Each structure stands twice: as structure tokens, then as C-alpha cells.
């Protein structure tokens, strides 16, 4: 069956790189949402917790439950807040009005992305609702919209963020609250700005990538995951024979072809014409592709960024397309 290889050596290298930039592994929260960017959330969580990471960020409550044994501090970005051991991101005032007493919350502040988050002029109202419902403010954060782009917008938005922090500090004094944890930097922002907050939320860099322009001199990270497929069968295809759905590929000469057990249900795009190990013959099927030759296994990609550029997308999309049903094998 198709499977994913994961390099522990690459993971250690990436973690050392981001830890050095952040000022220590204690200032890193590993972003493990969406099945750890396709790497397999439980296995990846186990590895990275053993390497010293204490904080994790996930998308849902279900993801948090899967890794609860590995991290003492877990932030959930997109789920209904509960009064339990997890911390929950709050994006609007409506959610604050229905919190259970004791719920641990991180207020997300909209500093310019305008996707979600509490508006700057709503911050004090948010504090009033926190007090009213006796929720626990444990964090305040934002998200940068252009950290990996060749522009100065990151600096403008970071100025907004500094203003937010000052306002929050004034409000915690007013309401006699403990100082929350501040966090804003993602992978790209960490390498451009460093980390002056309590921690940075690091996702894509742990997996071996940034989308930073070369002018920013991005760090030398190593891809953790590679996607592989195994041979199902080989056959001789005669000159003039056509193969696959629609018969869109026609052999120009006699050739040996092989079927491999990865298709568009396994992380390959249906429109894809080639993989790292060669050209795809005909159309991609749901569960298989055809290549010339008879290798026992083939590499779909070992560098998601390089492959993504050929496909007109970004490394993130290729990685999260690796489905959960694929087995994941750690090497090194």
C-alpha cells in the first residue's frame, strides 16, 4: 500500500532551527492541526513531545483528545469551548456570552487580517463578558496575514499587535486579572521578526518548509515527510495500445508499464501529469497511477515545496492532502 515516510532526523533539525530562533523550545507551540499537516497527529505528537515541546495547537476538540497524553498545554482553535483542561480560541463576543464558568480562553484579536477575531474597539467589552461569565483569560493572540510575502505589511500589522498588547495590559490591571500569554508569530513571522512574545505558533517550519521569498534568506529546513507508492503489477504495452480511463495515453513503441497503488484518494491531484519519479501515463485513477518501468516502489514527492510549484499551489496543500488512511513509517 501507499505510505508516508517520516524522517526523525529532519524533525530534530527543524526543531533545533526554530528553537534557536525563538529563544528556546519552551517558546514554541507546535501547530498540529489537520492531522499534523498530514503527517499523522498522534505519531507526530509523540515524537515532538519527547523532543521537549510542551505546548500544542490543534483545530478541534477531537484532535486535542488524541494528543492529550503528550502535552500539558493544548490550545484549540476552532471548536465549541468547554470547561475542561484545554484552552479555547475565542473569535467573537457572541461566544463569550455563553461560556461556562472556568473555561480557559485565548482571545483572538483582529489586527488586520479581517478573517475572524475580536475587533480592536471590542476588546474592553470582551473583558467585561469574561468577568461576567467568570471565564479564565489565559491567552491573547493574533494572526499575521502577510508574514511570508514580499511586503512591509507584516511590520504594519505587528505595530497594531504591540498596541493591542499595551491595551490588554491596562485592562488586566483594571480588572485585576493575571497576565495572559501573548502569541502572534507563525513560522514565517518568527524568521522575520523573532519572538518577543511568550511563545510562537510553529507549524509549517517543523515539517520542513517556509514559503518565504529567497530575499529573506529563509532557514535551511529539511522536509520530514515523503509520499511513496508500491507496485501492483507490471505489463507490456504494445505500440499503438492505449491505457487508462479514456485511453488518453497511446504507446509510441512497445514498453513496460506498471500500476502503483496511489491515486487521487491518496494525495495525488487528478490533473497531475508527473510525480518525482517520472511521468504519469494517462489519467490518475482514484486508487492508482501508471508509470513506465517496473520499480517496486516510487516516490510521489520528497519535497512538497518543489512539487507544489509545479502544480501551482503551496506546500501546505500537498501535505494536508496526505490522507489519514495511509500508514506512516518513521525512519532515521
Curated annotation (Swiss-Prot):
GO terms for molecular function: alanine racemase activity; pyridoxal phosphate binding. The active site is at residues 33, 245. Its EC number is 5.1.1.1. This is Alanine racemase. It comes from Nitratiruptor sp. (strain SB155-2). PANTHER family: ALANINE RACEMASE, ALANINE RACEMASE, CATABOLIC-RELATED. Pfam families: Ala_racemase_C (PF00842), Ala_racemase_N (PF01168). Substrate binds at residues 115, 286. One of its GO terms (cellular component) is cytosol. Coiled coil: none annotated. Keywords: Isomerase, Pyridoxal phosphate. Pathway: Amino-acid biosynthesis; D-alanine biosynthesis; D-alanine from L-alanine: step 1/1. Its cofactor is pyridoxal 5'-phosphate.
Amino acid at each position: 500500500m501507499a505510505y508516508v515516510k517520516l524522517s526523525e532526523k529532519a524533525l530534530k533539525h527543524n526543531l533545533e532551527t526554530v528553537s534557536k530562533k525563538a529563544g528556546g523550545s519552551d517558546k514554541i507551540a507546535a501547530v498540529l492541526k489537520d492531522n499534523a499537516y498530514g503527517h499523522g497527529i498522534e505519531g507526530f505528537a509523540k515524537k515532538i513531545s519527547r523532543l521537549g515541546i510542551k505546548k500544542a495547537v490543534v483545530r478541534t476538540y477531537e484532535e486535542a483528545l488524541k494528543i492529550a497524553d503528550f502535552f500539558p498545554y493544548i490550545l484549540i482553535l476552532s471548536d465549541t469551548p468547554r470547561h475542561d483542561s484545554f484552552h479555547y480560541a475565542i473569535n467573537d463576543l457572541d461566544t463569550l456570552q455563553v461560556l461556562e464558568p472556568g473555561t480557559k480562553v485565548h482571545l483572538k484579536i483582529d489586527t488586520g487580517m479581517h478573517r475572524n477575531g475580536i475587533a480592536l474597539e471590542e476588546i474592553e467589552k470582551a473583558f467585561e463578558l469574561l468577568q461576567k461569565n467568570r471565564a479564565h483569560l489565559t491567552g491573547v493572540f493574533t494572526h499575521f496575514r502577510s508574514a511570508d510575502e514580499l511586503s512591509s505589511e507584516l511590520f504594519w500589522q505587528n505595530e497594531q499587535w504591540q498596541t493591542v498588547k499595551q491595551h490588554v495590559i491596562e485592562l488586566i490591571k483594571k480588572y485585576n486579572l493575571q497576565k495572559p500569554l501573548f502569541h502572534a508569530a507563525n513560522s514565517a513571522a518568527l524568521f522575520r521578526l523573532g519572538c518577543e512574545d511568550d511563545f510562537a505558533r510553529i507549524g509549517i517550519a517543523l515539517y520542513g518548509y517556509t514559503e518565504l521569498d529567497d530575499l529573506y534568506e529563509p532557514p535551511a529546513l529539511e522536509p520530514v515527510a515523503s509520499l511513496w507508492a508500491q507496485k501492483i503489477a507490471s505489463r507490456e504495452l504494445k505500440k499503438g495500445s492505449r491505457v487508462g480511463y479514456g485511453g488518453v495515453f497511446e504507446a509510441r513503441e512497445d514498453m513496460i508499464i506498471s500500476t502503483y497503488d496511489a491515486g487521487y484518494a491518496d494525495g495525488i491531484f487528478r490533473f497531475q501529469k508527473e510525480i518525482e519519479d517520472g511521468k504519469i501515463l494517462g489519467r490518475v485513477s482514484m486508487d492508482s497511477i501508471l508509470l513506465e518501468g517496473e520499480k517496486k516502489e516510487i516516490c510521489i514527492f520528497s519535497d512538497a515545496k518543489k512539487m507544489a510549484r509545479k502544480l501551482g499551489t503551496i506546500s501546505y496543500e500537498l501535505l494536508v492532502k496526505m490522507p489519514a488512511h495511509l500508514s506512516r513509517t518513521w525512519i532515521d
